[in-house]
Structures are given as C-alpha cells and as structure tokens.
Curated annotation (Swiss-Prot):
SUPFAM superfamilies: Heme-dependent catalase-like (SSF56634). Heme binds at Y347. GO terms for cellular component: peroxisome; plasma membrane. It catalyses: 2 H2O2 = O2 + 2 H2O. The active site is at H65, N138. Its cofactor is heme. GO terms for biological process: hydrogen peroxide catabolic process; response to hydrogen peroxide. This is Catalase isozyme 3. InterPro entries: Catalase (IPR018028), Catalase_AS (IPR024708), Catalase_clade1/3 (IPR024711), Catalase_core (IPR011614), Catalase_haem_BS (IPR002226), Catalase_immune_responsive (IPR010582), Catalase_sf (IPR020835). Keywords: Heme, Hydrogen peroxide, Iron, Metal-binding, Oxidoreductase, Peroxidase, Peroxisome.
Amino acid sequence: MDPYKYRPSSAYNTPFCTTNSGAPIWNNTAVMSVGERGPILLEDYQLIEKIATFTRERIPERVVHRRGASAKGFFEVTHDISNLTCADFLRAPGVQTPVIVRFSTVIHERGSPETLRDPRGFAVKFYTREGNFDLVGNNFPVFFVRDAMQFPDVIRAFKPNPKSHLQEPWRYLDFCSYHPESLLSFAWFYDDVGIPINYRHMEGFGVQAYSLINKSGKARLVKFHWKPTCGVKSMMEEEAIRIGGTNHSHATQDLYESIAAGNFPEWRLYIQTIDYEDQNKYDFEPLDTTITWPEDVVPLQPVGRLVLNKNIDNFFAENEMLAFSMSLVPGIHYSDDKMLQARSFAYADTQRHRLGPNYLQLPVNAPKCPHHNNHHEGFMNFMHRDEEVNYFPSRYDPCRHAEKFPMPPNVLTGKRERCVIPKENNNFKQAGDRYRSWAPDRQDRFVKRFVEALSDPRVTDEVRNIWISYWSQADRSLGQKIASRLNVRPNI
C-alpha cells in the first residue's frame, strides 16, 4: 500500500472515532483508571493525546488584524488594461480568477466586538495561473505614518497599555503628535466611516503604490480601490453600542448569512496610475502613504469586479491559517514606497512565526498553478517529493529558468543614509479638504469624537495644543471649534 495515497482529508471519513494515528476508539467518554474510584493510569494514551491536542490547538494571534472573517469567490476582468500590465489574470475582459478574501479589524483582539472604532483590513488572495497575488489593504486609503521605521511604534501606540492592558487615547495622541502627517488618517478614523455597518458595505484600498508593468516593459505606479456595489454604510456610536452589546460577531454573521442566502457581496475594482517619468510633475509625493492621489488629477479607471459567492468550510483552516504575504505575479511589482517594501518582509515573516516556514503548503495558501522549487523540509513539511536532486542547476533534473518577463531597469543614485521622503508634503491640506467636504452635522460629529479623545485625563496641555495647532492648519474653523469645546485658546 502506498502510504502517501491516503492523506488526511476529512475529520469525518470513518464511521467511528479514532486516535490521531488512526486506531479505533471504543469508548471516548471515560478515562482508564484503577477501578471506578481509583486514579487515572499514565498508560491512557487516548486521554493524554486528547488533552495534549486540546492544549495545543491555538496558534499565535496575528500581531495585527487578529479579528477577521473570510469568504471565497472570483474576480472577473470587465475592462481591458492589457496596455498597462502583462499580468495574466488581467489579460482580457471576461477572465475569471478564484479568490479568497479576509476582512478584519486592525488593532483589537480576536473575539473583540466588530462594532469598535478601528480601521478594517481588506485582503484579497488571487489564485492566478502564474502564482498567487496578495493585495493586502484597509478600508482607509492612507496610513498614519510614512516611514516604515515607525510602523511597529504606531501599532503599539494604538494597542492596549502594556501595564494595564487598556486601550487609551492618550497613547496614540501622544505618539501621533510627533507625526502631523497622520492628520488625514485621523480624518478617516474619527469620521463616520470609522465604524462600518458590516463588511459588505465597506470600501477597500491597497494604500501603498505598486507598479504595473506592461509587455514592452513600461512601468507605472498604481493604486488599487475596491468600491462596494451596495454602497458604503456606517453606524453611529449609539447603534454600535446597541449591536455590540448583543452580538460581538455581527459583521461576520452578516457576511456568512448573506452568502448563504445567495445575496453575494460584490465590489468593483478601480485603479489610478502615474507614469514613472511623471512622478515629479505633481504637487504631492506619489510614494507617500499618508496622502491620497486626488481623483480629479489622477482619475479612477475601472478594471473588474469581485464577487464572494461561497462561505469557507472551516474557520480555522481558511481564516486563522489563511496567510497573506504580499505575493506578486509577473506584471505587478513593488514600487519604491518605503512602507510597501517593509511590508513585503514583515508579512511573510509573521506568517513564518505563526504557522511555520512551510505555511505556503497549507491548502488555503498554496498556489493552484503548478509550482516547483528547492525549498524543502523544515517544520511541518507535508509535501511528498520523490526526487534525488534538490539543488539547481543539474543535468539530472529538467527544471530550467522560466521565460523572462518584462522588468524595466531602474537606475538609482544617492547617498546611503537614513532620511525622510525628500519632497516636502503639505500635511494639512488634504485633511482640511476632507473636513470641508462634509455636511455640517458630519463635521460636528467629527469634532465631538476628537474632543472626547483629547479629553482623556492623561492627555497633557502640550499635546492638546499641538493637536489644536494641527487642525487649525488644516482648517481654521475646525481648530477653533476643538479649542472652544476644550476651553483652550488656539495658538494659530
């Protein structure tokens, strides 16, 4: 008998219970002991295995995006962008690619209410014919900091106090007071969209600028946008308190039940593109993740649609073990965006920590196309490889290099040094523009929320004055409103 022919596939493929090694169990309700009232015997392997498995069934939580829900479906190209990219899954209208999507809250812990104010994750894994493409983003188009060196710090600032394990506004207001570029992110965070009504009515953004490369090797910067066809909807604090008090998983439940009922969620994918040679023509830095590309300057272009039409079969196998690692395919590449380049390491590294070095062998993470390399063995390797050559090149193995795909030369010059993005951006303009675009009642709600955060007793007068100064530079009336409600005289 070929032992590799019979691989574990289902927990229910025998009519009776077995041990992990397959031995039949005739009693799964009582321990082995010395008589009815005697002690348990160490030889009760069945009990030891059951308890040992139980105490090890949890894996490390994600460091961020711990609370999440997943669903499966497809992406279909609706508009021809073959002039922009040679990516196979975007080659022509009508092409469909299977996907799995994970929605999440960013900061809060696994099991926390989905009604808390928090950015949401929007991650899509495309199982293409040329490998997996992971597009990992959020429901905000911007991030709080622009340099990757500060990424761990901003996450820690938003997470609970390490002494009390309480999430306190003074911590992130203190940290971000050193980062005026965070203003636009706060204009999203404390806006109505800070609490989406569910995942189906939520936008998604790639946040960072990627590169699209076409067949001739021409490269363009690109940003990705997901727009829900059912519209964007959010909930106010009162509704969030009411729903969160009765159901911590309302968004997960809504997603699951909608798909089960045949009400399939759908999003449209749009892109913005900038020619590499045109990067310096704009009054904003295209590689800065703390600002957006104005749509009146860089218009949206439609690409395709994302449809989620199948629920996952097992939450642990297809949500907890689902791993996004910024995977790329020919025709899509990283840009010089510093946050993106750091994420390309961080995402894969955290999956190796959570799931082990062979996390890409797990069915939910493995590519659906043929794949081959000499990365083998290591913890939890379960791929049977009948081979004698595990190196490259070799005259005994027909494996060869693939056909080279277009990759433009990128000539770089500069000193090796630690420095910020050189172009001086206006940290306040887009935040002010966003605030002024709201109706008066929406503006008032934003002011109320930010004033409540600044009213944390641990927030010092110095920090309050810094934030009043920042918001005054974004919009003078906004700064005055915040100062008035705090009974503080603005300095600007």
